[in-house]
Structure formats: C-alpha cells, structure tokens
Amino acid sequence: MKPAIQYWLSLASPWAWLGSSRFIGLAGRSGATVEVLPVDLGAVFAATGGTDFRRRSPARQGYRQLELARWSKRLGIPITLEPRHYPVDREPASRLVIAARMQGVDVLPLTHAILGAIWHEERDIADWATVREIASACGYASSASGPFYC
C-alpha cells in the first residue's frame, strides 16, 4: 500500500514556500500520494486565539523576518520578505488547487508555483488572470474544455 499524505497548508505561507521543494522531493522518494488541502490560517488563528502576523508586536514581526531570512539562506531558496502583493487573498488560488485536485490532477507542481509566485516572483494570486497564467505555465488547462475550469 502506497503511503498517503494529507498536506494542509496556506497557499500564502512563506514557510510553505521554503519547504515546498523538499516536501515534493520527500513525497516523490517515498512514492506517497499527496492530497493538497488549502487552509485559511487567518480563520484558524481567529478560532484558536492565534495572532495574525500583522497584529503581532514589532519584536515578533522582526523575529519572523529574521527567521525567514535565515531559513532562506540555509536552504538556498530565494524569498522576498515583503512581497508587493502580501497579505493576499488566497481564495482564487485555493479554488484552483481544490478544483484540480477533485479532477485527479497532481497539484503539487501547481502548489509550488503558486507559492513561488508570491514569495519569489511577487505576483498577485488574488487576480484570476494571474492564477490562470500560473496554471497554464504548469501545463494545466484553464478553460471549460480542460480538466478543470477557473
């Protein structure tokens, strides 16, 4: 029996971006099937007493930036610490990932591209045109005639 992984993540998480390549490699080496499940961390924080990063103290915000920079350097993965389009509405990208997953499409490359669009390329994943461009660049159809529609 193949291992199965439920991969819960925010499609706007800088930590998900930094771990994405390694996660994809791990899943590939293990032969695991991966179910990508986008989650709204803002809603999770609100329900569990967590604090959105924008409402954290300046000291905590600074430490977050420091740790992101450290991990970026350690992993050799470029990251823009303050991208133009962040915070960003994740709904269009999340809907795309969910729709593609429901059609049986391997969405790990798409998920990686969405994360990179924010944290490396500074693109706006709240914009449907951008999301369709990302899908197309990953080889996914983004019209009603394709495997999923967005």
Which sequence ranges carry the predicted segments?
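Extreme N-terminal starter segment of soluble prokaryotic enzymes
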Residues: M1-Q6
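GST-like fold's C-terminal all-alpha helical module
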Residues: V107-G116, H120-C150
